[in-house]
């Protein structure tokens, strides 16, 4: 049952996780972690896509071709592929606070180094290293998943990630203004764009410092180091079984694939939209940046509403409802991406369709992380890292194939046609959602396996020796909370049995295992 302790102005579940997301509060540890996670993620987006915001200026100063600008964009999203996988393991070991601070501090020098680039090679290299900071996404989702109850974790994850993703739009608005302000102050244009990168670089250091000073890893109010000293966090066991649980679960790979064509599509648009509007419609940089920013800024509500819709649909329809709404929403996003490429002769139509496209695309991103926490309790960080990396892989492949164009293996299309085929690809690959099946909840088209309960699914991640040591207890508490994913029909049956009986069943199963 939910409890309200004196020091928390909101209800907690049996794991000490918040059952609400009061975004106006900064209460330790739940809401402070929430705000620190999305702010760090926001800044990683600002810095990663700041070069795309100034692409026309940088392109002219460094004498880059459009193909080279596109390939540099590919390098930016490639940087985070391995970084996200590594960060998933890292946060499972040391906690999200150190993970977030490390991501920011280790990539801040690369942001400053953008002022030193001289040609395509150095430009692409620096974008690669700045892009490593996008692994902040894993810290963001892991931290929120640690702090919020399973019934609202989709909402919490989606709001935090959505507000973080806004950085991809905000930079298109902010960076041209910073550049123009420096230039108006008397600095030559070829120097002004370089000076502009000292702003996000400095903010990286500030946000990392605040994370170390104010962040707390765990709902108990303690960090991972203290919990390990007490023995509370030995429940993770050895690292290899954790990695095996995450990478050995086929659901992780399907979600990584489909996330590559929601978040991956979003990253691709963030990389190309300003240059597209600048070239296609003859706009100046400030106007192209402001209009391009709209796509990313829709994250202020769109990704959050995706998580909310996923959580709401799960109440009557359970996990099967989450899967259905993800497939429908992401398919609609792909369809509107196709339409956007077809209306390239009209700026007004392009912007209107872009807004609709962005809403569905970003809602699908949020819906993915309404499902991800249930794939594996023991390897939540690894699964988050793999799914997050899938977003970057999708972006790298999509941009390399459709938007970078002059190599023999690349397809040389007009930019409008590139949007069309990106949408077709997204619609086709989203079909993979239909193959996700949980034995205790079912899939889009099939029901659960008779007699299988949540405890069975999460207990299989632990060996008999680990169960004997009691290392599985956290997973059993999570299994009990996750019974809410059955939907109304099974939930009424659960209510009839009662929480106590469910806890007894879990204890018996843990003993006999």
UniProtKB/Swiss-Prot annotation:
It comes from the Eukaryota. InterPro entries: MFS, MFS_trans_sf, NO3_transporter, NO3_transporter_NarK/NarU-like. Keywords: Cell membrane, Membrane, Nitrate assimilation, Transmembrane, Transmembrane helix, Transport. Its main location: membrane. Induction: Up-regulated after a long nitrate induction period. It is a multi-pass membrane protein. GO terms for molecular function: nitrate transmembrane transporter activity; nitrite transmembrane transporter activity. Coiled coil: none annotated. It is found in: Cell membrane. The keyword Cell membrane applies. PANTHER family: HIGH-AFFINITY NITRATE TRANSPORTER 2.3 (PTHR23515). NCBIfam families: 2A0108. This is Nitrate transporter 2.2. It comes from Chlamydomonas reinhardtii (Chlamydomonas smithii).
């Amino acid at each position: 049952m939910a409890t309200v302790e004196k020091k928390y102005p909101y209800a907690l579940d049996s794991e000490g996780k918040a059952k609400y997301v009061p975004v106006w509060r900064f209460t330790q540890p739940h809401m402070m972690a929430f705000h620190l996670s999305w702010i760090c993620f926001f800044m990683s987006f600002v810095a990663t896509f700041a070069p795309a915001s100034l692409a026309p200026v940088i392109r002219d100063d460094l004498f880059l071709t459009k193909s080279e600008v596109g390939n540099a964009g590919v390098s930016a999203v490639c940087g985070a592929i391995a970084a996200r996988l590594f960060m998933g393991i890292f946060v499972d070991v040391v906690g999200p606070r150190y993970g977030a601070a490390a991501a920011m501090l280790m990539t801040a020098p690369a942001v400053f180094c953008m002022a030193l680039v001289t040609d395509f090679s150095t430009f692409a290299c620096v974008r690669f290293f700045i892009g490593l900071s996008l692994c902040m996404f894993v810290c963001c989702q892991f931290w929120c998943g640690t702090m919020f109850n399973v019934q609202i974790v989709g909402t919490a994850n989606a709001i935090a990630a959505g507000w973080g993703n806004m950085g991809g739009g905000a930079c298109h608005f902010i960076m041209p203004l910073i550049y123009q302000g420096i230039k108006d102050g008397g600095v030559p244009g070829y120097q002004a764009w370089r000076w502009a990168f000292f702003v996000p670089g400095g903010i990286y250091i500030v946000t990392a410092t605040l994370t170390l000073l104010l962040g707390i890893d765990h709902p108990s109010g303690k960090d991972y180091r203290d919990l390990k000293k007490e023995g509370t966090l030995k429940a993770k066991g050895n690292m290899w079984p954790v990695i095996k649980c995450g990478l050995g679960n086929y659901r992780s790979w399907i979600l990584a694939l489909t996330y590559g064509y929601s978040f991956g599509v979003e990253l691709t648009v963030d990389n190309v939209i300003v240059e597209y509007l600048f070239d296609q419609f003859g706009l100046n940089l400030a106007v192209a940046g402001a209009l391009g920013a709209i796509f990313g800024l829709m994250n202020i509500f769109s990704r959050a509403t995706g998580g909310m819709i996923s959580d709401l649909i799960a109440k009557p329809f359970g996990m099967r409802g989450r899967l259905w709404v993800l497939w429908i929403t992401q398919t609609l996003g792909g369809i509107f991406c196709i339409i956007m490429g077809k209306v390239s002769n009209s700026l007004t139509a392009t912007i209107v369709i872009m807004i609709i496209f962005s809403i569905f695309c970003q809602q699908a991103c949020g819906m993915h992380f309404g499902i991800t926490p249930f794939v594996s309790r023991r390897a939540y960080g690894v699964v988050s890292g793999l799914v997050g990396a899938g977003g970057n892989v999708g972006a790298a492949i999509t941009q390399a194939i459709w938007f970078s164009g002059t190599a023999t293996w690349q397809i040389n299309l007009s930019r409008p046609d590139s949007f069309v085929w990106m949408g077709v690809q997204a619609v086709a690959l989203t079909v993979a959602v239909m193959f996700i099946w949980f034995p205790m909840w079912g899939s889009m088209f099939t029901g659960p396996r008779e007699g299988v309960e949540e405890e069975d699914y999460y207990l299989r991640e632990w060996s008999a020796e680990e169960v004997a040591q009691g290392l599985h207890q956290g997973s059993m508490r999570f299994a009990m909370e996750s019974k809410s994913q059955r939907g109304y029909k099974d939930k009424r049956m659960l209510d009839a049995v009662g929480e106590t009986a469910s806890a007894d069943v879990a204890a018996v199963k843990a003993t006999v295992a």
